[in-house]
């Protein structure tokens, strides 16, 4: 059947993770997968969907467009073509959207940001999602979301009952782990990273609150350290009140997936000042690489980041320092605290982070998701 990913075949835009399917099960599927995400740019949603696709048990029929489509044409394919190709089988849509005409469907909705803060998005994008999500959430059989925070916001914004939403947290890919000193040294040399650095990884858009980080960094102005911003530049730099980058700040651009663990492992501290996250992959990925984390205390982030690090308590399992995302002085204080931290404290924070991130694995996430899908497919 057209659009089915079978064993040994990998379409364009796929990463290097093997896809494990048994042909006999693919030929007689009970669950179809909305594979539109396979042709989209890699973000947290696409990372989740690909991780799930690589980990799930056999039995999925992956339906995707024949060729990569523009966003507008992708929406048309999803709404008009996908439900016909799926037929009566259960459809799982892992990337926030799905066809409105398909009631026998499970949708993974990662957050309610378009409903809570439409001003953060382009006009057309916000209008479409504000029209689609509440109607889709009320029509389909089940919603999966990735945090208790997102569940509460979806209940409030979409007017759906508690029992219709299952919370299944995301996971951290196994490639995020501490790398060797030799690999770090080679990476530093190739990218001319001569000083110790603090790191932010993510898109540079208003809700990520990078402008607050830049202002806190300007207040600190540490002479022996630089701030690395890894991600695509956006209109955050045109916000009123901020026009120039502080000294010792470097725009690193987009990081290749295979280099991201090294970039994280080599950092002095990872800083995540986001105003709104349905889950938040980057802090957990940094923890998994042994990098100390400073994180906003907003939305889902305390739920995902776990207990705060307590240097005075040897039994503390915390791996993160939190701050109010509107308080630049508090952020500057936390950065200074990590930079002045005794080596043993930093190592303890690092060990705690590796242990905490280990709780979020794809096998657990996939098994819980598969159980929910199979129960609905057989009922």
Question: What do these predicted ranges mean?
Answer:
Residues 7:
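Cationic, low-complexity basic patches in intrinsically disordered or flexible, solvent-exposed regions
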Residues 10-379:
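Carbohydrate transferase catalytic cores enriched for Leloir-type hexosyltransferases
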């Amino acid at each position: 059947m057209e659009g089915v990913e079978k064993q040994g075949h990998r379409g364009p835009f796929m990463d290097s993770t093997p896809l494990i399917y048994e042909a006999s099960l693919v030929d007689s599927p009970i669950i179809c997968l909305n594979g539109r995400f396979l042709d989209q740019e890699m973000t947290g949603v696409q990372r989740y969907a690909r991780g799930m696709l690589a980990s799930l048990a056999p039995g999925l029929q992956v339906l995707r467009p024949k060729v990569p489509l523009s966003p507008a044409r992708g929406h048309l394919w999803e709404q008009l073509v996908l439900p016909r190709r799926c037929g009566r089988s259960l459809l799982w849509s892992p990337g926030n959207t799905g066809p409105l005409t398909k009631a026998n469907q499970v949708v993974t909705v990662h957050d309610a940001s378009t409903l809570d803060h439409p001003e953060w998005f382009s006009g057309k994008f916000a209008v479409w999602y504000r029209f689609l999500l509440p109607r889709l959430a009320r029509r389909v059989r089940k919603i999966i979301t990735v945090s208790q925070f997102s569940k509460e916001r979806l209940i409030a914004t979409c007017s759906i009952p508690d029992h219709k939403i299952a919370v299944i947290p995301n996971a951290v890919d196994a490639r995020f782990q501490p790398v060797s000193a030799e690999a770090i040294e080679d990476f530093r040399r190739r990218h001319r990273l001569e000083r110790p650095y603090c790191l932010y990884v993510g898109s540079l858009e208003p809700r990520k609150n990078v402008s607050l980080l830049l202002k806190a960094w300007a207040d600190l102005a540490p002479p022996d350290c630089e701030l690395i911003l890894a991600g695509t530049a956006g209109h955050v730099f045109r916000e009123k009140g901020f026009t120039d980058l502080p000294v010792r700040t470097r725009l690193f651009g987009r990081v290749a997936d295979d280099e991201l663990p090294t970039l994280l492992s080599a950092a002095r501290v990872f800083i995540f000042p986001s105003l709104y996250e349905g889950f938040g992959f980057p802090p957990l990925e940094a923890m998994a690489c042994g990098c100390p984390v400073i994180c906003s205390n907003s939305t889902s982030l305390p739920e995902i980041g776990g207990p705060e690090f307590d240097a005075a308590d040897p039994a503390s399992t915390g791996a993160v320092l939190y701050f109010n995302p509107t308080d630049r002085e508090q952020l500057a204080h936390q950065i200074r605290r990590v930079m002045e931290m005794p080596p043993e404290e930093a190592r303890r924070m690092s060990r705690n982070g590796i242990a905490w991130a280990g709780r979020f694995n794809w096998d657990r996430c996939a098994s819980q998701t598969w159980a929910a899908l199979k129960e609905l497919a057989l009922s």
